[in-house]
């Protein structure tokens, strides 16, 4: 017997027909052989076999699998129901596709970034070495170490296979290949770095111990991306030379294309660590992998056994005890993105739940209109279980259809998330849908069908059959029992929507507060472009000063340029931290400030106001008395008791006199904390401006972390960008210029995370409110249709249309009010998820809660009034005759 009969009803029918005809033919031939005429034989054979259809059905019942047959019949009926109600079907499928797609996209992000193991061999054994102060707790641990600590870990912890790395040059370094120039990201790593990760170069080799010693041969390993884009995928590049930071390096290796480049590094060079220079501060990170047979706990015990000796050069207070331990690499890498993804996942989950509740309410309404159909099925012998099974299969078919479209929607939503969030969270750009996301989509489809299908199915199975067959439509479930499930679902929708609206409202309030901050300068018309001076051709202050002076002179004569200047860093970004002390304060133990050098008229170009004293001018040169200008925060925090002008400070480069005070500008963090200073995403910490001509020799070492930025005020960004490139190229043709950015873009980037989360949660909150409004609208519309005769009688007896509409609409508003109160209470707990993203706004901000409740009530009133207006079409006389 063919296996097709288990899967195809038509195939089974054809098989049974053929078999029946064969038996009839054989019996007919037998009767003819006994002497019957062909007509007599055919008639007797048919009489002997009986009704062919009944026989076929009997054979089907004997041979078919009952479960498959029943399920197949229910599925086919579900498709017929879907075809009869195209509007409902389309609404349900599209709603499910969007919310399942959103859940799939967010799961894909969470899976790829938070859940999936790192793409290295035995990733669970990879860790960072961290350092913390015992009395401060491990939550305040740092991942940075000095040269002595690294050497002791390397030489005196035999259970660890470890490697060190220096901070990647965030501002980039100069790469010259032939006549082409580019700014690339460089990271210095110790010789064992790639072997600790377990990923060797695809071509060539990693660094040798000789290359990693101070003064060793200069070697470089290229990323696959740089090798393809800059070197054209030349397989013979290994062994050849390039100019990096103005110095010759030999290419020794190329990393694989699937190597996960955590810091988006383009080139790696030997660390060549020591206890001097950079190694004198906590500028190294250490990764480690316990050797075979050694557990993480055993390795940590060896680190602790080092005692306080690794911290000898850090000069901690005698009452502080420093400790070393291991932090799993996976945990450390996702620390900065875990909260946004968790929050986004929670928001999407709430929207999914609201969608399920909404669909359950719609199915309840449709169940009322199908009361006579369901009652007929039950009267003909279908039990409650059969009715529940049929309705659950209808819900499952809807959910699977929505899930199928949800895969496409998930891909589109993921691409949208990457487009708007990739600049803020670089990890998002490496994410793609895969089979795990497909399984999640299928699981979501199945679970959502259970959530939104069960209540309507159970409710429909409780139908009063006699009442349903004797009355019209949906009045077969008597009393309030037919209304409370839908009302409860609407209240639930509104409550969950309020939670999202409050969350979005708090994020909006935070963003508005950030936007209301006075930047301290005029950003309109400003364009910026940076240049890396971490280059062998710029090792003296004189070389840098000539670059600044000549390029600014060229810019001053460029068409469309109004003014230009150079600064070490920009507002709305991080600036350099420097220690200083007042010369006239004998007991001054030292303080910390942000600092920057200035060439040209920075204050005039950016329109930073002078508060008192004077500005830095071209007359402040290396041959004149060293001076400085400070901002208002410096004067307020550090010289509150006396006028700061005229005071002398000692900082990098010697003593200098403060000659002026300018207004504050906003920065993205400060790197230190002072009581009374804002700790939000934007702040105005103390800041010292010094003339570049008087400070470059002392501050040129900071070009490892910071690059000088040309700031130009011009008619357009395009004109300014061209002018900067031409001006710098006229001085040094081999010096690449970074991408030109409008100052407004720099400002937007500083609050990009807040803007992104506000936008995403806001969109989800709007979707939740729309679904809740649809639920209220559907409930009121169904109520009006159900009460059509009652309302007609009321109008015939003299009730006014306005009062009737108001009474109907108030029912929806009352449900929304109950939901708003419940949602407000839930929000008090839910907003803790976003507490770390709020600034200058309390998590129980009364304005936000009040506005959300009022907005929900207004929307619910509109959603209730629209269907209530249908009574305007009622003709009382016609209604009474009906």
Give a label for each model feature.
Residues 355-399, 477, 774-816, 820, ...:
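Interfacial "coupling" helices/loops that link adjacent transmembrane helices in transporter permeases
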Residues 1-94, 289-291, 312, 466-480, ...:
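Negatively charged linear elements and acidic catalytic determinants
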Residues 118-170, 282-287, 302, 327, ...:
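Membrane-proximal extracellular/periplasmic loop immediately following the first transmembrane helix
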Residues 49, 172, 185-210, 216-342, ...:
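Mid-to-C-terminal secondary-structure elements
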Residues 110-125, 130-135, 260, 266-276, ...:
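Short juxtamembrane loops and helix-capping segments at transmembrane helix boundaries
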